[in-house]
Amino acid sequence: TIDIKKFYDHCTREPVYHFFVQKLKTSPDVAEILTNIITYDGSIPTGCPTSQIMAFYAYFDMFSEVYDIAQKCGCKFTLYVDDMTFSSKEPFSPHQLRQMVDRVLRKYGHRPKYPKVKYYGPSDYKPITGTIVTPRQSLAVPNGLQKTIYNAFQSVKPFIDAESHSEEDVKQILSLKGQIQAARNIEEGKFPEIRRLIN
């Protein structure tokens, strides 16, 4: 796995503008207006509804080059915003792949977050974008999320059966339901008893 360091901060307005002009074939004046709407202080802001999709399309050529590198190394490339994962059933050189990806990222004004560059072997549990991939290639809920759900349940347990709930109680219960749903999106039958008790 390779994370891109301060990805949104380095997603500048120029690639956004070029996306509108070159890919969507808008006129330069329309591209300028759209770029002004989507960027803030010269970059794509973190947390806006448009940010993820715009960053992907503005840097589509960069991600295409990374994809080509993955193919050459015999890897499958998956991407979630700035989290890049390279997986293969066959051994490959993570050092060589990292160097080639580093060159491409730097060409586009980005660079890897080196402390977050990790290599996992076939027998390792691999944390990838909010899930764990087990050595048997199945998905598992991360321990951190399981602990969060358990702790949240301990907080709401005293007032689950109350006839009425405060606004704060309702928020806590709804938050717990959302966390359980996130876990069940990874492992379908996870937390059946807690789910039954809070429904």
Where are the regions a protein language model picked out?
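Short secondary-structure junctions
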Residues: 69-74, 107-111
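Right-hand nucleic-acid polymerase module
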Residues: 2-29, 33-48, 57-64, 92-199
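Catalytic palm active-site di-aspartate
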Residues: 1-5, 47, 51, 72-89
